[in-house]
Amino acid sequence: MLNRFSYSSNAWHNLRVDGPDADGIAVIVLARSQSRNALTLPMLTDMVQLLSAMDADDSVKCIVFTGEGPFFCSGVDLTEGFGEIGKTRDTHRDAGGKLALAIHNCRKPTIAAINGTAVGVGITMTLPMSIRIAAKTAKISFPFVRRGIVADAASSFYLPRLIGYGRALHLFTTGALYPAESGLLHGLFSETVNAASSTLPRALEVARDIAVNASQVGVYLTRDLVYRSPRSPEQAHLLESAALYTRYQSRDFEEGVQSFLEKRKPRFQDTMREQSGEGVLDRGDCVVGLAFKPKL
């Protein structure tokens, strides 16, 4: 495990980090309100580093992202550009995509508290997150075609899976700005709140519920099952069975049952570090974090 340190004491570029608190909740704030929280390459790089550190830190149980001021994020800062372009098509890697993959690969649940307008990578960076909560006043846009480019941050993978191909194509094709409650965005947000000021408090409520009541390892494996499950129910059944086999032998399973029977809050002890050491979360096979592939 990494030695615990104060994330807030590090000189992150236009990011403020609060926590983790006593319940294990860390908050990453996009703190560039004078530029509507537009992202720079150093900010994107720092978030990737933060996610890597928090992923390995057992004291972090849930990560919440939000924006400073009235905006969540207005996308990439176009005055600074998109960073260095690779020497060839095969070597170029989208910086927003690197962040999206860092979020996807982070084993801790992530929540977007979208307190205001989110545009471009400002919204696509939230697609790999576990939960998105938005203010009803927020405006959302995927404006890539209006800038002469294409979707970024692996959003061509995530968005259709979240809201369906028809709505995703409409949003991508028009590049227009839509209110958070638009029918075109149906399914993108698990909750919307009336006031922008209520977005972060509600996200923290959800994060605390997860941190206090859910097994970290159980949450991670379940999310991996959702994203990596095969196409047939039979194959999904085999993978779920393999994952259940490992969890039935865990301390968290014993504690989950015992706390339910005793009508008390669970005190889960399994950590990512311990499970990784046993090979349960070995990503080598790329099959729901299991260290083996069941025979189909």
Curated annotation (Swiss-Prot):
Disruption phenotype: Abolishes the production of AF-toxins and their precuror 9,10-epoxy-8-hydroxy-9-methyl-decatrienoic acid (EDA); and impairs the pathogenicity. Does not affect growth rate of cultures, sporulation, and spore germination. One of its GO terms (cellular component) is peroxisome. Enoyl-CoA hydratase; part of the gene clusters that mediate the biosynthesis of the host-selective toxins (HSTs) AF-toxins responsible for Alternaria black spot of strawberry disease by the strawberry pathotype. AF-toxin I and III are valine derivatives of 2,3-dyhydroxy-isovaleric acid and 2-hydroxy-isovaleric acid respectively, while AF II is an isoleucine derivative of 2-hydroxy-valeric acid. These derivatives are bound to a 9,10-epoxy-8-hydroxy-9-methyl-decatrienoic acid (EDA) moiety. A motif (Peroxisomal targeting signal type 1) lies at residues 294-296. Signal peptide: none annotated. SUPFAM superfamilies: ClpP/crotonase (SSF52096). The lineage of its organism: Eukaryota, Fungi, Dikarya, Ascomycota, Pezizomycotina. GO terms for molecular function: enoyl-CoA hydratase activity. The gene is AFT3-1. Gene clusters encoding host-selective toxins (HSTs) are localized on conditionally dispensable chromosomes (CDCs), also called supernumerary chromosomes, where they are present in multiple copies. The CDCs are not essential for saprophytic growth but controls host-selective pathogenicity. PANTHER family: ENOYL-COA HYDRATASE_ISOMERASE FAMILY PROTEIN (AFU_ORTHOLOGUE AFUA_1G01890) (PTHR43684:SF4), PTHR43684. This is Enoyl-CoA hydratase AFT3-1. It is found in: Peroxisome. It catalyses: a (3S)-3-hydroxyacyl-CoA = a (2E)-enoyl-CoA + H2O; a 4-saturated-(3S)-3-hydroxyacyl-CoA = a (3E)-enoyl-CoA + H2O. Belongs to the enoyl-CoA hydratase/isomerase family. Disulfide bonds: none annotated. It holds the Pfam family ECH_1. Keywords: Lyase, Peroxisome, Virulence. Pathway: Mycotoxin biosynthesis. The keyword Nucleotide-binding does not apply.
